[in-house]
From Swiss-Prot:
Biological role: Hydrolyzes diadenosine 5',5'''-P1,P4-tetraphosphate to yield ADP.
Protein name from the UniProt record: Bis(5'-nucleosyl)-tetraphosphatase, symmetrical
Pfam families: Metallophos
Similarity comment: Belongs to the Ap4A hydrolase family.
UniProt keyword Hydrolase, yes or no: yes
Entry-linked InterPro entries: ApaH (IPR004617), Calcineurin-like_PHP_ApaH (IPR004843), Metallo-depent_PP-like (IPR029052)
Reactions mediated catalytically: P(1),P(4)-bis(5'-adenosyl) tetraphosphate + H2O = 2 ADP + 2 H(+)
EC number: 3.6.1.41
Gene Ontology molecular function: any one: bis(5'-nucleosyl)-tetraphosphatase (symmetrical) activity
Keyword annotations: Hydrolase
Transmembrane residue ranges: none
Keyword Magnesium attributed: no
Species of the source: Nitrosomonas europaea (strain ATCC 19718 / CIP 103999 / KCTC 2705 / NBRC 14298)
Enzyme class: hydrolase
Length: 268
């Protein structure tokens, strides 16, 4: 049995199948950990969703910002944006089944010495607190309040956490941290303007995982979202978004020995 963590797929179904072939994946024996952003921008989100559902318990995934965007569009809360490739999912005969499956995925997964999350964790969150906060928002996503909340889900404020936050502000901070964050101030305030390489992070900001006092630093965080960061491996960090949808590559790391597997994502 092996566990393969895989970076942002974004509708790249063919490359996903190529990666499974490369690693010799066996659904009766092995497990896949997916960092989220399963859908959108790529050519075949519909087939990818269907394949993941067919794989059943072999798949553990967390929601990314594009996955939440699909759910918000499907709820009628927001319109599609330029570059979205979600229409085939929305028009599919089994659309309700696909969306219901997606809606019931996690924001945060903690197992043994690993955490799986799409973007990151705020520095003042312990693993235990992050788990509780994620479950709080998962309840919203799966319930009747999501349609209303999703209209304002992605505002940039508040930009930091404090325990007094309530309602939509509270849920927005949790979602922003777990699905959108890349950098913070040294005090833990999120900044969403920086999307480039590590070398381009401006003075006064740090990658969220380099905040010295980060409460989760002793746990290995597996994440994606930051394609300009690319494959980034440190003792307690596995970053996996290598820009498949931008014709980079699709990356998997086998957690047991950190062996790296990659397939090029050139479009034909």
């Amino acid at each position: 049995m092996a566990t393969y963590a895989i970076g942002d797929l974004q509708g790249c179904h063919r490359h996903f199948l190529e990666l499974l072939d490369l690693i010799g994946f066996n659904a009766t024996r092995d497990r896949l950990w997916l960092v989220g952003d399963i859908v959108n921008r790529g050519p075949d989100s519909l087939s990818l969703l269907r394949t993941l559902i067919e794989l059943g318990d072999a798949v553990t995934m967390v929601l990314g910002n594009h996955d939440l965007h699909l759910l918000a569009v499907a709820a009628g809360s927001i319109r599609q944006q330029h570059g979205d490739t979600l229409q085939p999912v929305l028009e599919a005969s089994d659309s309700s089944r696909l969306l219901d499956w997606l809606r019931h995925q996690q924001l945060f997964h903690h197992e043994d010495e690993y955490v799986l999350v799409h973007a990151g964790l705020l520095p003042n969150w312990s693993i235990e607190q992050a788990q509780i906060l994620a479950q709080e928002v998962e309840t919203i996503i799966r319930g009747d309040r999501f349609q209303t909340f999703s209209r304002s889900m992605y505002g940039n404020v508040p930009d930091h956490w404090h325990d007094r936050l309530q309602g939509e502000d509270r849920w927005r901070v949790i979602i922003n941290a777990m699905t959108r964050m890349r950098v913070c101030s040294p005090e833990g305030r999120m900044n969403f303007s920086c999307k480039g390489e590590l070398s381009s992070v401006p003075d006064g900001l740090l990658p969220w995982f380099e905040i010295p006092w980060r409460a989760s630093k002793d746990t290995t965080i597996v994440f994606g979202h930051w394609s300009a960061l690319g494959l980034h491996l440190t003792p307690n960090l596995i970053a996996l978004d290598t820009g498949c949808v931008w014709q980079g590559c699709l990356t998997s790391v086998r957690l047991e020995d950190r062996k790296v597997f990659q397939v090029p994502c050139v479009r034909h």
